[in-house]
């Protein structure tokens, strides 16, 4: 049995009860759906409802789009998902990995080419 009070979870009693009760109430189809994290290509409500939510996905991997559209899509999915979704995006070179109008910074090789350890530190901190 996994100890949910320890790293990396650090859940309190109420959170653990929510996890256990939620898991018990899930159908086999819902449990299988949690294994999938599809790429979100559209913010269209019909698409999100049919393709994403009807399959009980465990999360979504976003590709670049306008920040407001990404936020609207994410909010819609979280509000309509029975279980909170995990979120993924390619953020190796900054916020532009999810939002085209996000802040861009150099990739790891570009930072290494500067020879400046402070730049590397700042990249790691972000």
Put a short name on every predicted segment.
Residues 1-56:
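Preference for extracellular/luminal or secreted protein segments
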Residues 41-126:
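Enzymes and membrane/adaptor proteins characterized by extended Gly/Ser/Thr/Asp/Glu-rich
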